[in-house]
């Protein structure tokens, strides 16, 4: 079963896809946001292309667990996906995923210019990998 991980942002949506066994997450692409409807069509295309059976969307909580303005936008996006898709959509805590993605890219010596283009899909893969690790531990 393939699972899609999404890192939702104001300008871009990072996309990661799991392997068929649900063990590893791989950053796939970055969707440059347009309208919600156009973004949805791109996501639907990826669901079909990768035969995705579940979607995980990272929820940007504050360090104290509270939800800020960015989380409210993400919640609206999740609600939109849940109403528009047959594929189940779940929420996953994404605290510090972008910070972790930035650290990984810096350690890999990726230039600042290139980091900007890939950070969202790396963050999506970190979100998805966290979910996969949790699921695998749960059902180990």
Curated annotation (Swiss-Prot):
Transmembrane segments: none
SMART domains: YqgFc (SM00732)
Protein's cellular compartments: Cytoplasm
Coiled coil ranges: none
Gene3D superfamilies attached to this UniProt entry: YqgF/RNase H-like domain (3.30.420.140)
UniProt GO MF annotations: nuclease activity
GO biological process: rRNA 5'-end processing
UniProt keyword annotation of Nuclease present: yes
Entry similarity comment: Belongs to the YqgF nuclease family.
Function: Could be a nuclease involved in processing of the 5'-end of pre-16S rRNA.
Official protein name in the record: Putative pre-16S rRNA nuclease
């Amino acid at each position: 079963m393939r699972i899609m991980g999404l890192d939702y942002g104001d300008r871009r949506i990072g996309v990661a896809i799991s392997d068929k066994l649900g063990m590893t997450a791989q950053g796939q692409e970055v969707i440059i946001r347009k309208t919600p409807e156009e973004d949805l069509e791109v996501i639907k295309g990826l669901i079909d292309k990768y035969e995705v059976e579940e979607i995980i969307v990272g929820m940007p909580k504050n360090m104290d667990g509270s939800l800020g303005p960015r989380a409210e936008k993400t919640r609206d996006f999740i609600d939109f996906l849940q109403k528009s898709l047959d594929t189940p959509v779940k929420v996953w805590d994404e605290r510090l995923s972008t910070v972790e993605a930035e650290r990984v890219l810096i350690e890999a010596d990726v230039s600042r210019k290139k980091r900007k283009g890939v950070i969202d899909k790396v963050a999506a893969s970190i979100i998805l990998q966290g979910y996969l690790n949790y699921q695998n531990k749960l059902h180990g």
